[in-house]
């Protein structure tokens, strides 16, 4: 039951150790963030959690959590399958991604709602999310789609640089190093990853559109889709995001 006692228990118990939790929200809510790579979903997710609370479940973080195998515990069945696939360099199957999200969404903190970033990416995953929520007698409150012109996304992603030694990230326009081409932290060489080159970015955007457009149509048909122009700076984009979420409270 969602009560003051449960909220206090969450703050003092396992929920306090959740990697990406914010303040306890006024009521449980469930939100998905959609949009192509480079559109700024992660930044908006952090702002949402800081302002409104709930768990931030990113599929990227789920995989990193699985790979780290926190606290030395034996991996869950889904984690074990994901780890084996990643070790082989293979793609993790839809079923395994769904199982990992189901496991993470079952943590104590997530009973107060969660924000999904990077999931669902396929129509099959969208159906699976309906099942995950249905099992706990919850429904999705909204699916927020962030969009921006392709040229702007390519500019954002192609400007990224990473230190060859310590992996610290930079951006030629938004977060430049003090010395061009050199890492502030260790002096290592800054490189552009292959998947941050313009042609690779175009390929990623095409692949995203092919798999995610049916997801957008699905949520549009259910009356859950909200569209946000993410061309502006993060704060101005968050003003649009905030207005949407405040209507859910």
Place the predicted regions along the sequence by residue.
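Glycine-rich phosphate-binding loop of ATP-dependent small-molecule kinases
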Residues: 1-249
């Amino acid at each position: 039951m969602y009560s003051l006692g449960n909220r206090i228990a969450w703050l003092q118990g396992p929920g306090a150790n959740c990697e990406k939790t914010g303040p306890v929200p006024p009521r449980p809510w469930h939100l998905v963030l959609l949009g192509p790579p480079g559109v700024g979903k992660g930044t908006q997710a952090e702002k949402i959690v800081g302002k409104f609370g709930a768990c931030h479940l990113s599929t990227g973080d789920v995989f990193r959590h699985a790979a780290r195998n926190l606290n030395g515990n034996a991996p869950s069945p889904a984690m074990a399958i994901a780890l084996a696939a990643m070790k082989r360099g293979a793609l993790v199957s839809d079923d395994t991604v769904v199982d990992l999200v189901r496991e993470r969404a079952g943590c104590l903190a997530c009973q107060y709602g969660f924000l999904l970033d990077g999931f669902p990416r396929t129509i099959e995953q969208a159906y699976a999310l309906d099942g995950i929520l249905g099992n706990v007698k919850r429904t999705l409150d909204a699916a927020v789609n962030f969009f921006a012109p392709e040229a702007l996304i390519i500019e954002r992603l192609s400007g990224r640089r990473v230190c060859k030694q310590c992996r610290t990230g930079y951006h030629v326009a938004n977060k430049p190093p003090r010395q061009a081409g050199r890492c502030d932290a260790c002096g290592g060489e800054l490189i552009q990853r292959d998947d941050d080159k313009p042609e690779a970015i175009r390929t990623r955007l095409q692949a995203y559109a092919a798999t995610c457009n049916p997801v957008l149509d699905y949520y549009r048909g259910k009356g859950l889709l909200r569209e946000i122009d993410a061309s502006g700076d993060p704060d101005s984009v968050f003003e649009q995001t905030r207005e949407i979420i405040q209507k859910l409270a």
